[in-house]
Curated annotation (Swiss-Prot):
GO terms for biological process, alphabetical: translation
Quaternary organization: Part of the 50S ribosomal subunit. Contacts protein L20.
Matching NCBIfam families: L21
Classification lineage: Bacteria, Bacillati, Bacillota, Bacilli, Bacillales
Protein family according to the UniProt entry: Belongs to the bacterial ribosomal protein bL21 family.
Presence of the UniProt keyword RNA-binding in the record: yes
One annotated Gene Ontology cellular component of this protein: ribonucleoprotein complex
Organism: Bacillus licheniformis (strain ATCC 14580 / DSM 13 / JCM 2505 / CCUG 7422 / NBRC 12200 / NCIMB 9375 / NCTC 10341 / NRRL NRS-1264 / Gibson 46)
Protein name: Large ribosomal subunit protein bL21
Top-level taxon of origin: Bacteria
PANTHER family tied to this protein: 50S RIBOSOMAL PROTEIN L21, LARGE RIBOSOMAL SUBUNIT PROTEIN BL21M
InterPro entries: bL21-like, bL21-like_sf, Ribosomal_bL21, Ribosomal_bL21_CS
One Gene Ontology term of the molecular function aspect: rRNA binding
Length: 102
């Protein structure tokens, strides 16, 4: 059984026991999180939401909070001696999917 959930402005396909990286959630390591925006549930009984499936939830356990690898943004204007170098590290939450309730 699998489901498509929406979190952090992104849609993610998840299965039970899978580890996923989502946008930062307000939860500490070891806490249980519930995703209510379930768009699709697949398997033997397929359920398609419009926009979400009624009563369907996905629960998971937060493994850790972290930050992704650093990316470098460099803006440059030729002939003007103008440049700007900037770095960014996106925060994320590592979640293990425990149960899909449909």
């Amino acid at each position: 059984m699998y489901a498509i959930i929406q979190t952090g402005g992104k849609q993610i396909k998840v299965e039970e026991g899978q580890t996923v990286y989502v946008e930062k959630l307000a939860a500490e390591a070891g806490e249980t999180v519930t995703f209510d925006n379930v768009l699709f549930v697949g398997g033997e009984n397929v359920k398609v939401g419009s926009p979400t499936v009624e009563g369907a939830t996905v629960t998971g356990k937060v493994e850790k909070q972290g930050r992704a690898k650093k990316i470098t943004v460099f803006k440059y204007k030729p002939k003007k001696n103008q440049h700007k170098k900037q770095g960014h590290r996106q925060p994320y939450t590592k979640v293990v999917i425990e149960k899909i309730n449909a």
